[in-house]
Amino acid sequence: MDTLHHRDPGVVGGGLTNEGVYVEFIPDLLHLNKDILKLIVLAKGEDKCIIVTDSLCATCLKKGMYRLGDQHVIVTDNGARLKNGALAGSIIMMAEAVRNMINEVGIDPVKVLKMATLNPAKVLGVENYLGRIAEGYDADMNILDWDFNVERTILKGRCL
């Protein structure tokens, strides 16, 4: 992707300044610095931001080497990287992404949860039954503790 440059804002600048565009980002603090994450939220507002994980098949697995198609992915404390050092994708879980946005970036928890729930539902066109806790909506949710760890998952109103 083109970078943001002061003389040529490119795709990034267009996404940040076009009010009709939602912006998706991976808040693993590897793909984007916490100050850039804050800049995105300030530029777009909570209604146009979507938290994604882009998690690879190596998510939740031990450190080591894994395959992604025909490429080798090395998982370390520094994320999932290709042999040349480039990021291969993310190994972050959504609860950690939410935690990073709140604890590291400093965004209000209510705004962060909207970016992880209702906003994606709107983009997918399912906001009439997903994305919030309300009468008539599917009761799909994760119950988090005060450190934003998943304690329980509820799907269609049933505890898993």
Kindly label every feature range from the protein language model.
Residues 1-5:
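Phosphate/pyrophosphate-binding betaalpha-module
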